[in-house]
Regions:
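Catalytic Walker B motif of ABC-type/P-loop ATPase nucleotide-binding domains
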Residues: 124-128, 133
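ABC-family P-loop ATPase nucleotide-binding domains
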Residues: 46, 55-112
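Conserved coupling/switch loops of ABC nucleotide-binding domains, chiefly the family-specific signature
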Residues: 30-33, 178
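Helix-to-loop junction immediately C-terminal to a conserved catalytic motif
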Residues: 24
């Protein structure tokens, strides 16, 4: 769906990168096929021009300069904004006269992120986009992405382990486990369906006896249980505390189940 930012979440080995590679035509699926507007994506330049995937892998000749890579990208992605790419490189402190092979892990990620933010296609897939970036560069990336997204409607699909960082950015959550989609829901609706209860072990156990528990933590004499459902705050005893779950904690409990 266009004009939406998705978070693709899953544990290591869950199949996130494989799924993105299949969707973007990098590899062929064992069964089934990926279509866009009724046309198969794999080995279809017309459809592939509507899709871009940024990942850890470099698809450019390593001896190529960053500036030349920008020009090269425009040959395939005709709406690539080279002027904006140069401007973003300046913001991130990326020298465009550097060869790609000389870039550090962080600046290699920045180079690929700039490409992703300037290709101007309907579907942009970002696989671990902030790998190697320091806190300042990560914050700059999220800000620039939101600014670009606001003025250029597109679907952004972000696959990342930094769930807490992206939780305020993404609008739709997709969680996969063992190669299958566990859930797909808007972030707000998802977080409204779960909550946590904290208090003494006995008080929490009494409250949660008839609830749908998805996980629990115990520290000393205190216990927290994580519950699927909507709390009736009028019936909450005074000796327990009800709080909303954050996305990272919910992800951990759902994928540990």
């Amino acid at each position: 769906e266009s004009n939406k930012i998705y978070g693709l979440l899953g544990r290591n080995g869950a199949g996130k990168t494989t799924l993105l590679n299949i969707i973007t035509g990098k590899i062929l699926a064992d069964q089934g096929k990926v279509t866009l507007n009724g046309k198969e994506v794999f080995e279809n330049d017309e459809m592939l021009r509507k899709i871009f995937m940024m990942s850890e892998r470099n698809y450019y000749p390593e001896g190529m300069k960053v500036s030349d890579a920008f020009r090269w990208t425009k040959e395939f992605y005709r709406k690539f904004d080279e002027k904006k790419a140069v401007s973003l490189a300046e913001q991130f402190g990326l020298r465009t006269d550097r060869k790609i092979k000389s870039l550090s892990t962080g600046y290699g990620s920045i180079f690929r992120l700039i490409i992703a933010l300037c290709v101007n296609v309907p579907f942009v897939f970002l696989d671990e986009p902030v790998l190697g970036l320091d806190a300042n560069h990560r914050e700059l990336f999220y800000r620039v992405m939101i600014e670009h997204y606001s003025g250029n409607p597109a679907a952004y699909i972000i696959s990342t382990h930094l769930i807490e960082e992206v939780s305020t950015v993404i609008e739709e959550v997709i969680i996969i486990r063992n190669g299958e989609i566990l859930l797909k829901e808007s972030r707000e609706d998802l977080l409204d369906k779960y909550y946590s209860v904290t208090g003494s072990i006995s008080a929490v156990d009494m409250y949660a006896a008839d609830k749908q528990i998805i996980g629990e933590d115990i520290l000393g004499g205190m216990k927290t249980v994580y519950i699927e459902g909507v709390p009736d705050r009028n019936s909450v005893p005074a000796n327990v505390e009800i709080t909303k779950m954050d996305l990272q904690k919910l992800f951990i409990k759902l994928t540990n189940a």
